[in-house]
Structure formats: structure tokens, C-alpha cells
Amino acid sequence: MKKPNILFLMCDEHRFDVLGYAGNRIIKTPVLDSLAKQAVVFNNAYTPSPICIPARQCLMSGCLPKHCGCEEYGQDLPAGSMTFARCLAAAGYETVACGKLHHMGGDQMQGWTMRMGADIKIDPHYIPTRQKSAQADYKIAGFEKWSNAKEIKRAGVGENCAAQAADSYALSGALNFIKDRFVDAYYDRANTEQPLLLKVSFNRPHYPYFTSEEKFSYYLNRVPLYDKDTVFDHPFLSRHRVQIGKDVSEREARRAVAAYYGMIESADSDFGTIIEALEHAGQNIDDWIIIYTSDHGEMLGQHGVWEKQKFFEASVKVPLFIRWPKKFTAHRVEKNVNLCDIFATLCELTGTSVPEGLDSRSLVPLMETAGAPWDNETVSHFKDVGGFANVMIKKDNLKYQYYGETDSEVLFDLLKNPTETQNFIDDDTYCEAVRRFRLKKNELGY
């Protein structure tokens, strides 16, 4: 059987509920909404780490941060590590990546046979003797930036020139590749039957929050202020809180949210351009597997917090759908899944053997039947400045969090308290669940 072509679409920092198909009536995402209508949508997909680089390395490797050695910002996979791109390339795929991958180390390809992106570089801090101090320097600087609300205050109409140029380069690279591979008579097609994995990954809607005047004007008085009065006091979760009326004005917060929405709409439009290019090149996209996701979410001021690096739903939960209408009927899955699971899923969908030692579970059973048997647990974790462990374990509707020996544990019950404002960790009703979570945390090595 001929292996299917795969289109893997990805954004950076896309909050799970800022999508039309997720029930958001304000955002305009017609392309992703249309794709999702014929897809299996995972309503409870989580990132293995709510930090950019670890999340992406876990996605590539199919392993949790502790198991792939990427627990902190700036850590990259060891050269030659098994990735889903390397695995599919070995199985005969042409693997092409356009746009942001955020690989920091010496292995800039990680199994991609072709790569077009503005972030192809080895970070100068990725030198073993300097790595620890470099990460600490980066994070401390980042905390100062967050604490003075710089990104919120400067948000609005404008351009993030570097990110915009990178996304334009990713889009043009994808369009030129599609033309070369499927249309141009001069393209070298020694193996016309070779299957293709094409990944297109944008920076948007990662801050800085800038968008066009047209989109900004449309969203400014429509977007919500995300639970500005809803807070949860905790030494880590409430760190670097930005208070409306004190640190920023309500208008400034609204400007940032409006710009964020505009960035998502523009990314959606560019995804549509890619789909149109494939169709104009004679491709039937119903024959393709199409995946959409993000590395993590964005707080957008919920609980008074912006950006990511939290285990609140807005930060740790991600959009995820997989579309292959000729094989799977559209439906929604409520089970807890993880970005790590994409590796094993791609292997099963393409008839490729799954490498040993992964934390990845194939999602195919859930794609076939939403209620298929499933261990309804998922994990996310990272290390803070100083190497302190932060761990989240979600089982069914309960979400446990561990922040080392000094900060208190947290237990959210998303069924009883979906806004995540009440800590049930000391509630006797949950004592057995807490005991099991602590055992699992110990099994993870924390």
C-alpha cells in the first residue's frame, strides 16, 4: 500500500480555545475550522513542557523532558537522536521542514532531509561548559521582562520584523517546494512515488503582540479580558503577575489580546494559502494526513499571568487535530493525550515500526473510536531556574502539580472548578488520588 503524504501545520504559543472550532465566536480561523470539521479533534491535548524548546524536542523525540534530556530552556536533543522525522526518512519519506523548529544544538536537521527556516543556527550558548549559566542568564532576564509587562505595554499595530520575516520565509519556502515537487517540469523526480512529510511551522502568535491595523481594529473592542478578577495565589503559579489597573491599564491588556487574535487570523490565512497551493498542484488533500498543533498555549492575562511556563490550562493545553477523512470519520476525543504521542501515531498511520524506549502512545485507537480503552493520564514537566522540578500529572479530570520541596502542591478538579481557582490538595475527599499522584511523581524521578 502506498504510504500517505503528511502535512504537519504548527504555530507557536497558540492557546487552545482561540479557534472557531473550539467554540470561540470572536476569532476568525476559517481554514483550521474547515479542516477540523473532517478531523479527529483532541479536546484534551497537552504539551510535555509549557516552554518552547523542551516542548518541541519532546514532540520530535516522542519522549518526556526528563527522558530526552530537555528539561530546561536551551537544552537540545543529543546529535543523532531518534526523531519522528528521522524515523520516517528511514522508512522512505522525503521529510521537509519549513519554518520554526527551534533546534538549538549541533544537530540542526534532526532527520529532516530538507529544511527551510530562518532559525537554522547553533545557539552560541549551546556549549557544554557554558550551558547552565547561559540558561540561568536567559531566564533571569526573561523574568525581569515579564515583571515589567513590557510585551503588554508595547502591543498593538505594528510588525515584529524578525518573526514576520521568518514566517514569510517559511510560507514562501513551502509554496516554492510544492511548486517544484508537484508542478515544475525541471524538478528532479527520480522517485515520483516517494511519500512526503511536509511540516510548516510559524512563529505566530508568539509575542511580541503585533498585527495589522485592520485586524487590530476589528478585534480591539470584541476580545475578552481573560478573567481579570480570577486569581490563584501560589508561590510559582502567581509569580510575575501583571495586574490590570496597577501594572498595565485595561486598554493595554485589551490591545495585547486583540493583537494576539490578529496574529492567529493571519497564520490561519497563510495555512489556507498552502492548502490552495497543494490543490492547484493537483493534490487531493483528502488523500493527505493533515495535523495541526502548537508547542504550548498562552495565558493572555488569565489569573493575571501572561505568556506560558505555567500548568494552568491556558498554558499547558494545546490545540490538536488529525485529519484523514478517507480513513477516519470526524469526531471529538475527550481523553488526555500528549504531543509526545504524535511520534507513535505517525508510525502507525504510515506502517512504520515504532522505536523502543519512547513515551509516545499511538492515538490511532482513539481516532478509530473516541471511547477506545485508554490510560487517561498525561504528564508535563520542566525545570525552573536553579534546576527546581515542576511536574504536572493529569488523570481524568484531576490535575496534580508538584513544585519541589519548598512550594505547595496543587490539585485542581477541572470538573468541579474549571477556572482553576480552588486547590483541593488538602481535601480529604481526594486523599487517595493525591497518594497515587505522589507515587507517579516518584516514578518519574522527582
Regions found by a protein language model. Give the residues of each.
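Formylglycine-dependent sulfatase
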Residues: M1-Q401, S408-E409, P418-N442
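Residues forming the ATP-binding cleft of Hanks-type serine/threonine protein kinase domains
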Residues: L415
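Short arginine-rich
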Residues: L444-Y446
